[in-house]
Amino acid sequence: MAHISPDGPDLADYGLVEVRTAELGGYTVDFSTVKQPVDMTLMLRGLPDDRCQCPHWGIVTEGSMLVRYADHEETVGTGDVFYMPPGHVPTYEVGTRIIQFSPTAELKATDEAIMRNLAALQGT
């Protein structure tokens, strides 16, 4: 059985956020800890409508996030289980921890845009 632990050894530190990631049955599972306030607006540039087009399911285990859609916004807090349909832009508070499940194939385009935009913002 494939599994991932929140304390597992494969930690990726992106400066603003630390993430442990595994692929399980066609889904990417992330344990994320936000170290600085994160507004994903700039990171999602270049995607359709400059919004994440990958659906996500998860739980906020600590902190909160604000998720903006074209026609409304939602706040998700500690203990809340969420579904983010395509077309969202999240913002995370410092100290927020989430466990998130995303279809791996759909997440690929989002991850590529984030890495490209992060490199551009860092001047690399």
Task: Set out the residue ranges of the language-model regions.
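A short, N-terminal "cap"/entry segment at the start of jelly-roll beta-barrel domains
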Residues: 1-42, 48, 122-124
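Short strand-coil-strand connectors
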Residues: 25, 68-72, 93-95
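A cytosolic small-molecule/anion-sensing beta-strand core signal
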Residues: 61-62, 86, 94
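Short acidic-glycine-tyrosine-enriched beta hairpin
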Residues: 69-88
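Double-stranded beta-helix
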Residues: 91, 95-124
